[in-house]
Amino acid sequence: KNLPECNVEMVTNGDPLNPKRLNKLFESGLDKILISAYDGKEDADKLEDLCVSANLTKEQYIVRHRYYSEEQDFGITLSNRSGLMENAEFKIESLKEPLKKPCYIPSYTFFLDYQGDVLMCPHDWGKKVILGDFKKEKLLDIWFSKKSSSIRKMLNKSNRNMEPCNVCDVEGTFMGKKNAGYFN
């Protein structure tokens, strides 16, 4: 209601979904759901059928195939997840020096985890930067807080000298340049 031009999306592995829950999410204001299928085509087909049974339109959902081979990068663009992939099975080393490029991700979106923590970036799996608590604070207060604004300004000026950005290999300029202009 308060942000009619805001697009609300959710990313999930689909485990907790059923038709009733899907419909409730969309009734509550969700615009699109992106569901990652990791276990093969059968899994993807089941998720597709689930969305159809909930009467979702093709514009309301995307089932993302994440089960491809290692040679196909598993169907995803791999990153070091802000330095957390060094100890993973598929090691991607942390950067020794921060990228000297802007990152616009916090200028056009934020991420809400299942506990209500508002994160600046989907790559901050270690939750190094928590912008606020959605259970206790209003979205706009978190979005326009000193902390959020300061981080956006730093990253928009190619300054990644803060955790976890200093070890992150994500380009961060794929989208959001126009939005970044509002925060400089």
What are these language model-derived features?
Residues 19-25:
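Distinct, well-ordered alpha-helical segments
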Residues 1-2:
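N-terminal active-site wall of soluble small-molecule enzyme domains
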Residues 5-17, 30-67:
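Core AdoMet radical
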Residues 5-7, 27-32, 100, 107, ...:
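A general structural motif
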Residues 123-184:
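Flexible mid-to-C-terminal extensions adjoining Fe-S/redox cofactors in radical SAM and related proteins
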Residues 10, 116, 139:
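Conserved, mostly hydrophobic/aromatic
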Residues 48-121, 160-175, 180:
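A C-terminal junction/extension of Radical SAM enzymes
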Residues 17, 103, 131-134:
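Short clusters of hydrophobic/aromatic residues that line enzyme substrate/ligand-binding pockets
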